[in-house]
UniProtKB/Swiss-Prot annotation:
Enzyme's top EC category: transferase
Higher taxonomy: Bacteria, Pseudomonadati, Pseudomonadota, Alphaproteobacteria, Rickettsiales
Native source species: Rickettsia sibirica
Protein name (Swiss-Prot/TrEMBL): Methionyl-tRNA formyltransferase
A Pfam family the protein falls into: Formyl_trans_C
Chain segments annotated as transmembrane: none
Length: 73
């Protein structure tokens, strides 16, 4: 899970990409919600905002704009 705009968002489905990056862990590195992590990239596929239904990434990003270079916690 991660926090964004004071809301907890659960990652329900994701894919790990074994790829190099030079970003701080938690940094959004694409507009498709790919997140830098320790030694690779996490591509989020499905998530759920607190008190809302689960959404695939396309549906979620239509209503929530998480900008590239945002650092998630």
């Amino acid at each position: 899970y991660f926090s964004y705009n004071d809301k907890i968002i659960k990652i329900l489905e994701a894919e790990y990409l074994n790829a190099d990056h030079h970003c701080t862990s938690g940094t959004v590195i694409s507009d498709k919600l790919e997140i830098a992590c320790g030694s690779g990239i996490l591509r989020v596929k499905k998530l759920q905002q607190e008190s809302k239904k689960a959404l695939n990434i396309e549906e979620f990003l239509r209503g929530t704009n998480i900008l590239k270079d945002t650092v998630l916690k």
